[in-house]
């Protein structure tokens, strides 16, 4: 689905409850009261839409890109939080105490029934906690699967609490039409969560894989290869990624996103370049051959297939080489006539992976800690290095594919924009958003 259509669909779904509230509501209230209700309605609708912006739905993420999907997910969560925080304060001057006999439409008052308000208060306290935890998760000592569990359960709990609060405490939510809409939207959102954590694992169970190779390719970096068990494998484009689960139940939360470093043209086996970092990856080299594995994917739009630019520029930092290596391998195996250049940055020489395979032609190695007699580039991947590597025509006509540390990508993207590289020729993948 194309980005403009996705944007229109998002706006339509989020504003649907607001529009219906205006159509089915009673006599208008004071502006600050209507604003309070409107912000609350928008906040709830946006929170429900967060479930389908999780990045696990290919119709969305594979067309607009995983980076755009997750950044939009984060941005909308923060805006929804802002709306939710403001919502109760705009009612401060509204008479309370519940409905009056002469005010059957609840035009003049708001409820003080604690049974109706308590769920809203609970959600009001949980929502900022969940958002702040997501923002700071990389700085907290949480295992990845623990954070995923907290995030998923927390989001589900907030949705259920807000549904009760909206239907029973809200002036508009109590209308039969609005109640039906909120029930349907909440049901679809919760259903999307069940699909990701129940239906997908069931489907994956019928398409198991097994580990065929675990090879060290550089300091603390490994290549893990898996082969399909009794099925044809995975259809994917070079540069995409999957959620990889090794040695666990399909329902386990111990799965991680890894870019595919092999090429589709190489056959059904799939390889991943994985760095020892923490949780599952710190023991990656100890995986035994034959261990069962499950793949959910492919995801992502970091692909140069079907593009028409005359050249491809691959810019990688560290383990960010993985998807770019898949692209390079595919181009070499298929005899792709397009020109290609690779810039590959690392801290030290022992971190350079696949050096023999990559070779020297049209490959620029960059080290921030260069040893004696180092012949390649030194320092970091920056503007001057890019200017030495690419011509003016290449900046404007080639497609640039980036993957690596956020700081490196920020520097490279800024310089490419300064050199008039069109945004549609700039593909990037971060896997880190805060």
Where are these regions (language model features)?
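Ferredoxin-reductase
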Residues: 203-294, 310, 335-338, 346-348, ...
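Juxtamembrane helix-capping/reentrant segments at transmembrane boundaries
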Residues: 66-70
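Short, hydrophobic transmembrane alpha-helix segments
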Residues: 19-34
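Structured alpha-helical
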Residues: 50
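FNR/FR-type flavoprotein reductase catalytic core
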Residues: 2-8, 12-15, 40, 44-47, ...
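Transmembrane alpha-helix entry/boundary detector in multi-pass membrane proteins
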Residues: 33-36, 114
């Amino acid at each position: 689905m194309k980005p403009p259509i996705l944007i229109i669909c998002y706006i339509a779904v989020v504003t649907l409850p607001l529009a219906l509230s205006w159509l089915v509501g009673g006599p208008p209230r004071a502006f600050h009261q209507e604003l309070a209700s409107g912000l609350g309605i928008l906040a709830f609708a946006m929170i429900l839409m967060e479930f389908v912006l999780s990045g696990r739905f290919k119709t969305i993420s594979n067309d607009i890109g995983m980076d755009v999907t997750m950044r939009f997910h984060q941005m909308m969560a923060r805006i929804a939080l802002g709306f939710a925080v403001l919502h109760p304060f705009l009612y401060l001057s509204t008479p309370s105490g519940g409905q009056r006999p002469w005010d059957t439409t609840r035009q003049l008052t708001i409820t003080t029934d604690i049974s109706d308000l308590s769920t809203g208060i609970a959600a009001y306290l949980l929502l900022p906690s969940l958002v702040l935890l997501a923002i700071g998760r990389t700085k907290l000592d949480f295992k990845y699967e623990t954070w995923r569990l907290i995030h998923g359960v927390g989001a589900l709990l907030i949705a259920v609490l807000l549904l009760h609060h909206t239907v029973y405490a809200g002036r508009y939510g109590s209308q039969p039409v609005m109640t039906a809409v909120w029930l349907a939207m909440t049901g679809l959102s919760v259903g999307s969560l069940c699909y990701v954590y129940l239906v997908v694992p069931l489907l994956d169970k019928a398409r198991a894989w097994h580990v065929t190779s675990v090879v060290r390719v550089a300091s603390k970096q490994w290549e893990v290869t898996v082969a399909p068990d009794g099925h044809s494998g995975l259809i994917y484009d070079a540069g995409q990624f999957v959620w990889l689960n090794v040695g666990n139940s399909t329902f386990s939360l111990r799965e991680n996103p890894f870019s595919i470093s092999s090429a589709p043209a190489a056959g059904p086996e799939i390889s991943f370049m994985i760095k020892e970092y923490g949780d599952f990856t710190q023991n990656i080299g100890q995986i035994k051959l034959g261990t069962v594995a499950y793949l959910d994917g492919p995801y992502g739009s970091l692909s140069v297939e079907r593009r028409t630019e005359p050249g491809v520029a691959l810019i990688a930092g560290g383990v960010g080489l993985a998807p770019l290596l898949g692209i390079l391998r595919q181009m070499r195996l298929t005899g792709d006539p397009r020109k290609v250049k690779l810039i590959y940055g690392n801290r030290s020489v022992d971190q350079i992976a696949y050096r023999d395979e990559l070779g020297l032609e049209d490959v620029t190695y960059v080290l921030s800690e260069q040893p004696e007699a180092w012949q390649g580039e030194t320092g970091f991947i920056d503007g001057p290095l890019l200017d030495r590597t690419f011509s003016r025509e290449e900046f404007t006509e080639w497609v640039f594919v980036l993957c690596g540390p956020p700081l490196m990508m920020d520097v490279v993207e800024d310089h490419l924009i300064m050199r008039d590289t069109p945004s549609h020729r700039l593909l990037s993948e971060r896997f880190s958003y805060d």
